[in-house]
Swiss-Prot record:
InterPro entries tied to this protein: Ribosomal_bL20 (IPR005813), RIBOSOMAL_L20_CS (IPR049946), Ribosomal_protein_bL20_C (IPR035566)
Name used for this protein in its record: Large ribosomal subunit protein bL20c
Species whose genome carries this gene: Pelargonium hortorum
Keyword Ribosomal protein (UniProt): yes
Pfam families, sorted: Ribosomal_L20
Amino acid sequence: MTRIKRGSIARRRRAKTRLFASGARGAHSRLTRLIAQQTIRALASAHRDRDKKKRDFRRLWITRINGVIRQNVLSYSYSQLITNLKKEQLLLNRKMLAQIAISNRNCLSIIYSAIIILETKEEGQK
């Protein structure tokens, strides 16, 4: 049986990882061991930050909604709005509410004033 040299296969594998780390600075884009380490770190960071991005956007949406609500009505807060939305079974998520808050503040004020009216009617019936 003939001997198979694996130099070309190893070179191809290293070239693939080199392409992945081509944007790194210094030795991290040139030396094979450092490229491997950098690749692992980059992929770990990407995985972690995909989840972090979701949390960051949720915080941003909540901040925007709360800011618009507190500008218009002093005694009303974000938590009260979300509680009342759930009670009335309105299917508006935080992303949609934040978009409404940015594009048309009057529309958001109409939504929470309608919720307040419904809430007072329910209290009057009890």
